[in-house]
Regions:
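Carbohydrate-active catalytic/glycan-binding domains of CAZyme proteins
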Residues: 17-499
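Bacterial N-terminal signal peptides
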Residues: 3-13
Length: 499
């Protein structure tokens, strides 16, 4: 199947290859970010849903002297259920007190209004009190592990250690006092790593950035390594690289930031790379917010110049990734705004109630802007900013299947499920509706489930009924095809649930 480069893909008719046997959806929510479950789609479009930027963005700015003139998330945010507190680990610019970067700590009761408690654990003669909790640490992917019997390992960190030029693990009893756990690096690479605990798989997962030659250029790409015990890690496996479509669209992304680029283009050097990944393990798949770095030339200072943006990727096994949309999932700010130049993200997005929150770092400069380097006369820190903001999605609403007033249909591949009812995540216009038909594997409507009562309105959990009845227990474990008849409606996900 083909996906267009636009943020909305119109399908008059699509028939996809389907699994050889019924796909087991269990009782997990199924998204339409990929087409694994789509047998046929007629007169519908698949639309990328942009994260809604919080109106108070940027939420965290550089306002302490030991932070330097810019911030990046380059770390993680968790919600601590025990303390009823959001906790953030982020980085500042190198300063006289902390000359080679530092990881800092902030807290918030609501995830919006942030404090920087002076609980720093790194000694420096310049400041008696500060909020620096680790030196020379980048991408502090912090996990609170309540299952570990050892309280000294309550907090775990996967990170890049600048002094060792490698990826390492650390542990802490409180998230403030850190001890290096790994003696040798998990692997070598290039300063960016995403790490988190995957509850479904029971694995610690890390995506390190390691250079790899792709079409004649040594590029930033991503590999996968996992661990069952946080100490022994698998050999990294290459899982995510830019393709020809990425390179072909490089110039278009560069044109968006032309006014703030420091050097002219070199067509021989123009290319796309993947700078980092923010992950979100949804119920049935893993989403990645890929930091797409588009290079227009070598920079006057540092290595390469170019902008960054966030694009959505999806995988069901952590190894094979699809990127159906090649446009930003968090819109770039207008030139001059705080997030018009480059983007980075926390290591793992958060589910907060019925929303998904992604904290991201935004800058008003590009990767090769002279202000990033100690070049005389560059206006270092006087014109540009780097801050941290928040993008929000409603639960499971990352891609919508849209139908016009004349109607459209989406038919799934055969699935087997567990549960006693069907819930649909959908939104309709005033005159719109969603009707669900349940069929056998051959497409024949099942008795009693030929056409549901029309679904109208906006809900994350519309309960589907047929003649007022919702029970589907008799179909559990049997191959079933779902047919969604949509009119003036957006379909985001479906799930079979049980009480």
């Amino acid at each position: 199947m083909l996906w267009s480069l636009s943020a909305s893909i119109i399908l008059i008719a699509l028939s996809a290859a389907e699994p050889a046997s019924p796909f087991d959806v269990g009782d997990k929510s199924q998204l339409f970010v990929d087409h694994v479950l789509v047998r046929e789609a007629r007169n519908v479009s698949f639309t990328l849903v942009h994260g809604r930027k919080h109106p108070a963005n940027p939420l965290v700015k550089a306002d302490q002297p030991w932070e330097g003139w810019r911030l990046e998330i380059y770390g993680n945010v968790i919600y601590d259920d025990d303390e009823k507190l959001f906790k953030m680990w982020y980085i500042g610019e190198d300063t006289e007190a902390f000359p080679d970067y530092a990881t800092l700590y902030a807290t918030s009761p609501d995830g919006v209004h942030w404090d920087k408690p002076l609980v720093g654990t790194v000694r420096t003669p310049k400041y008696e009190k500060h909020n620096v909790v680790a030196e020379q640490v980048l991408l502090a992917s912090v996990i609170k592990d309540k299952a570990d019997a050892d309280p000294a390992r309550r907090y775990k960190m996967i990170c890049w250690l600048q002094r060792d030029q490698g990826y390492h693990t650390m542990v802490s009893p409180d998230g403030l006092n850190w001890t290096r756990l790994s003696q040798a690096p998990l692997c070598r690479g290039g300063d960016v790593i995403t790490g988190y605990f995957d509850e479904t798989r029971g694995l610690y997962v890390a995506f390190p950035k390691i250079g790899f030659t792709v079409r004649g250029h040594d590029r930033r790409v991503f590999w996968l390594t996992t661990s069952k015990d946080f100490q022994t890690w698998t050999e990294p496996k290459l899982v995510l690289t830019p393709d020809l479509r990425d390179d072909a669209s490089s110039l278009a992304r560069i044109e968006e930031v032309r006014p703030i680029l420091d050097v002219p283009d070199d067509p021989n050097l123009m290319r796309t790379e993947f700078y980092g990944i923010g992950a979100y393990p949804a119920e049935s798949c893993t989403l990645a917010f890929v930091w797409v770095f588009t290079i227009n030339n070598n920079a006057r200072y540092g290595n390469q110049e170019g902008p960054g943006e966030l694009q959505l990727a999806v995988s069901r096994d952590l190894e094979n990734w699809e990127r159906p949309f090649r446009t930003p999932c968090v819109p770039r700010g207008k030139i001059g705004e705080w997030d018009c130049g480059f983007f980075d993200t926390q290591s793992r997005a958060l589910r907060v109630g019925d929303e998904v929150w992604l904290y991201y770092g935004g800058s008003s400069y590009t990767h090769g802007t002279p202000c990033l380097y100690r070049a005389e006369g560059t206006g270092r820190g006087t014109k540009y900013t780097g801050s941290i903001g928040l993008a929000i999605w409603q639960l499971d609403r990352f891609v919508s299947v849209d139908a016009p007033a004349e109607g459209g249909t989406l038919t799934t591949a055969p699935v087997v499920f567990t549960g006693d009812r069907l819930e649909v995540n959908a939104r309709t216009k005033a005159a719109g509706s969603v009707v669900v038909r349940l069929c056998d594997a051959a497409g024949k409507p099942l008795e009693g489930y030929a056409g549901s009562d029309p679904i109208t309105g906006d809900s994350l959990r519309h309960v589907v009924t047929w003649g007022g009845k919702k029970d589907v227990t008799s179909l559990a474990g049997k191959p079933v095809v779902l047919v969604f008849d949509l009119k003036d409606a957006e379909l985001f996900a479906f799930a079979f649930r049980k009480d």
